[in-house]
Amino acid sequence: MINDIQKTAEGKMQRSVEVLKENLAKVRTGRAHTGLLDQVEVEYWGSMVPVSQVANVTLLDARTIGVKPFEGNMAAKVEKAIRDSNLGLNPAAVGDLIRVPMPMLTEERRKDLIKVVRGEAEEGRVSIRNVRRDANDHIKKLLKDKEISEDEARRGEEAVQKLTDKYITEADKLLTAKEEDLMAI
C-alpha cells in the first residue's frame, strides 16, 4: 500500500517537474533555440498542428532560427503563425526559408523575465508540496483505519519527504539554469 502511494506521488511530482520544464521553455531568452517554436501552431488542411510538423526548424546561428516549410505554399501561413504567436518574434521570409531573428533583451526585460521564471518555479514547488501533502494524508488515513502500523506510516512519510526533496531540488536546478540563460548576454 505504501509503495503504491509512493509510486503515485513520484509520478505526480515528476509530472510537476515536466510541466515546469515546459513552462520555462516558453520563456524567451536572447538566444535562439528550436524549442521556442514548439508551442506555435499553424492551420494545415483544416486543423491546427505544431510548426515542427509542417516545416523543418533549425538554428541558422546563435541568434536566428530557420524555418523551411515542407510545402512551399505553407510559408506565408507559417510566417503569420510565428508573427501572431505572443513570443515577440518578427519572422522574415527569404525565398522558401523563413528567418526568425531573436531580438536582444534589455536589462529591464531580463529582470521581468526572471520574475516570471521564479514565479513558474514557485508554482512547480507548490505543486510538488501539494502532492506530498496528499500522499501524507493518504498514509495518515491508512494509519487511522489501522491498515498500517505507526512504523510503516513514519517510513512512508519519510520516503515521500525524500521524493519531495529530490524533485524540489530538480525544480531549483531548472530555475538556476534558466536564470543563468536569461542573464547571459
From Swiss-Prot:
It is found in: Cytoplasm. GO terms for cellular component: cytoplasm; cytosol. Responsible for the release of ribosomes from messenger RNA at the termination of protein biosynthesis. May increase the efficiency of translation by recycling ribosomes from one round of translation to another. Keywords: Cytoplasm, Protein biosynthesis. Disulfide bonds: none annotated. This is Ribosome-recycling factor. Belongs to the RRF family. CDD domains: RRF (cd00520). It holds the Pfam family RRF. One of its GO terms (molecular function) is ribosomal large subunit binding. GO terms for biological process: cytoplasmic translational termination; translation. Its main location: cytoplasm. It comes from the Bacteria. InterPro entries: Ribosome_recyc_fac, Ribosome_recyc_fac_dom, RRF_sf.
